């Protein structure tokens, strides 16, 4: 069992056509965030927490912001790819918890939809909560949105990714009998 943590932050975009996406949900009528993909800070934090827990490359290495293949990418699709990589490495997600820091928009009206979309992509429960800044700092001035996430993963006992570990454990067990 392993735990990963992450943090992501994006400034608001100057592009008036860009839509705010948080947790895989569009918030129409709100200024979007700047980024190479859809700039979904909640989903990005979840991705990085899962990758960290499994000891895999971080989101910037897996989905480079210099690679045109990821330009404008839907972050929920990136999350699914990250979970596929996690499972291929022999890990299964147990849960993810994410906290977004922003003053507007309020997440509560869309929280259940965000939770559902993220949980479906991860294949495990994902919780989302929001915190305000009370007007403090850059986020309080409306310069961007931040998110933090923690993820718990466990080894998949049926994965061949850990076959060397299992063989070694078996050898150690035989020496102690």
Identify the function of each model-found stretch.
Residues 2-8:
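Short amphipathic
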Residues 10, 15, 19-28:
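Polyampholytic, low-complexity intrinsically disordered segments
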Residues 27-37, 65-70, 135-139:
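A short glycine/serine-rich beta->alpha loop
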Residues 42, 46, 50:
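Active-site His/Glu-centered metal-binding helix of metallohydrolases
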Residues 49-92, 103:
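Glycine- and Gly-Pro-enriched alpha-helical subdomains that act as flexible
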Residues 95-140:
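Short, conserved loop-to-beta-strand elements that form functional interface hotspots
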Residues 140-159:
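C-terminal edge-of-domain segments
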């Amino acid at each position: 069992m392993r735990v990963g943590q992450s943090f992501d932050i994006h400034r608001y975009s100057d592009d008036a056509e860009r839509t705010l996406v948080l947790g895989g949900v569009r918030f129409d009528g709100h200024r979007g965030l700047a980024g190479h993909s859809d700039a979904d800070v909640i989903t990005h934090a979840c991705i990085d927490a899962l990758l960290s827990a499994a000891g895999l490359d971080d989101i910037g290495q897996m989905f480079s912001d210099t690679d045109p293949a990821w330009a404008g990418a839907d972050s929920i699709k990136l999350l699914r790819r990250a979970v596929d990589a996690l499972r291929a490495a022999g890990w299964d997600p147990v849960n993810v918890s994410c906290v977004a820091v922003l003053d507007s928009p309020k997440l509560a009206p869309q929280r259940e939809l965000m939770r559902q979309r993220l949980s479906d992509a991860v294949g495990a429960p994902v919780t989302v909560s929001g915190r305000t800044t009370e007007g403090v700092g850059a986020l309080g001035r409306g310069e961007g949105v931040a998110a933090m996430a923690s993820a718990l993963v466990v080894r998949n006992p049926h994965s061949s990714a850990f076959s060397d570990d299992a063989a070694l454990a078996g050898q150690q067990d035989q020496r102690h009998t």
